[in-house]
Amino acid sequence: MAIQRTDRLNSLLKEVISEVIRRDVRNPYVTELVTVTRVQISRDLRYAKVFISIIGSEQAKVETIEALNSAAGFIAVNASQKVVMRYFPELNFKLDDSVDKHMRIEELLGKITKERESRQGDNSDQLEQEP
């Protein structure tokens, strides 16, 4: 039962925090290419890790995470107006690199597929040449 509650809260916080970042945060380091990928709230509901996916350079990613962490109080105040909780959790923004890892895996799988196709093409050419 508690797990379902935290899952629902995580999902709700993800949507609300995403909306607050998109609408209310006015920081040049926080671009529109910022996506809240997931939220993990602690069991006591006092702390929440907010995982962010950012498209851009490594420096831009670091600057964006720093800007979001410095604006965490502002984001929490605005988000708390949309979510009824006894205590709104303290937000800690983290870079979610799972999207980058996924893209890297896709790239490697593409290379493997091309390599297999070229090997199969070479093998079929050799079979056709032998009488």
From Swiss-Prot:
One of its GO terms (molecular function) is ribosomal small subunit binding. Pfam families: RBFA. It is found in: Cytoplasm. Its main location: cytoplasm. Keywords: Cytoplasm, Ribosome biogenesis. GO terms for cellular component: cytosol. GO terms for biological process: maturation of SSU-rRNA. InterPro entries: KH_dom-like_a/b, RbfA, RbfA_dom_sf, Ribosome-bd_factorA_CS. It comes from the Bacteria. One of several proteins that assist in the late maturation steps of the functional core of the 30S ribosomal subunit. Associates with free 30S ribosomal subunits (but not with 30S subunits that are part of 70S ribosomes or polysomes). Required for efficient processing of 16S rRNA. May interact with the 5'-terminal helix region of 16S rRNA. Belongs to the RbfA family. Monomer. Binds 30S ribosomal subunits, but not 50S ribosomal subunits or 70S ribosomes. This is Ribosome-binding factor A. It comes from Protochlamydia amoebophila (strain UWE25). The lineage of its organism: Bacteria, Pseudomonadati, Chlamydiota, Chlamydiia, Parachlamydiales. The gene is rbfA.
